[in-house]
Amino acid sequence: VRLAAMRVVGVGAGAWGLPAAAELAGRGHEVTLVDRSGPANDLSSSPGPTRLWRLTHPDPVRVRLALRSVEAMERLEARTGTTVHLRRGLLWRDDAGPGDVHEALRGEGVAHEVVDPQDVGRFLPGLRPDDRPAVWCEGAGPVLAAASMRAQLGLFEAAGGVLERALVRGVEPVAGGVRVHVDRQAPLTADVAVLAPGPGAVGLLEGLDVRLRLRPRLEQVVHFGDAADPGATDGYACFVDRPHFADDGDEVPNLYAMPTPGRGYKVGIDRPLRDLVEGDTDRTPSERTTADITDRVRRDITGVPPRPLDAQVCSWTESPDGRFVLDTLPGGVVLACGDSGEGFKFSALMGLVLADLAEGRTPDADVAAFSLARFATV
């Protein structure tokens, strides 16, 4: 069913906001997308060449959404002729054992293999074994993030979408729609506003009287490899090494890793550089964090040269429970925030999900599980 054309203002041109704007424009709506610095800018959560997609999750809802996300990426590729994801497989190692992941994957019919602790190096060269079994799943690989954003921008522009670089100061439901207050210009009026502002959600939600404890923070990743041949690890598998305790009793933070074609093996650990506050535009990598990640690679992933080739800082926004927040607010406002470090793996799917919410469609049970209702008693 094709709905009557609406006026839509999107706030945030990142991994969720740009695909939503592109999808809505493609459905025939009049879409203006507002972002202070433009799509996937260096201050946002969405810059850089790659992210990690995976079917491996410890709960069935996210496994199902991940399967839908792969379909959405394939749809984007078919529409644009652009490759936006690669398949390399992923090894998941967890202090809790493979139980939850194994059950979630098996329940959704996803092929996988439980790997003995001493056999992990068969899937990732040089991975140091310990006493933890792992789970191997071929359904994983790099999202070609920059290519994906370019493809979405092309769809948005081809469908007549308008991009404005401006700072959004507030969003106000009014009779018959919504008013978006923009710095140094007249407010924008629309039937619906789609808010996917990343860290900017903190201030905008306060103005909408939504009480949600979001925590924007800065994280860092490092590419490793041989400078003379940075593509040597292009065929390597991805890896998630969940938090655990070392032999000496120290807590070891979560590690995630993937190949970036032609650039090296990308590794990050879940240890924020600092909380992100309004006005913080410094994205200088931390030498201490680079050294810590290098030590981890040298110790645990010996098949990757422990030589940093580059480092990058970007923002995450943690929700109170580490899960996305997707909902429709009274007065024609669609909310998408709390990426919690996993936003890009669902980027193409979020375009479809948020467009459906903007059109007033009832979300399915899996999408509805991410609504604000779960915080009603928090």
Predicted regions and their residues:
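Beta1/beta-strand and adjacent pyrophosphate-binding region of the FAD-binding site
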Residues: 3-16
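Dinucleotide-binding Rossmann-like beta1-alpha1 core, especially the glycine-rich loop
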Residues: 49-123, 131-132, 254-255
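Flavin (FAD/FMN) cofactor-binding and adjacent substrate-gating region
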Residues: 93-160, 164-165, 170-175
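Conserved beta-strand-loop-beta-strand element in the redox core of flavoprotein oxidoreductases
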Residues: 170-188
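Short hydrophobic core segments
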Residues: 11, 187-200, 351
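Active-site substrate-recognition segment that forms the wall
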Residues: 22-26, 82-85, 199-331
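C-terminal catalytic lobe of FAD-dependent flavoproteins
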Residues: 299-378
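Glycine-rich FAD pyrophosphate-binding loop
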Residues: 26-45
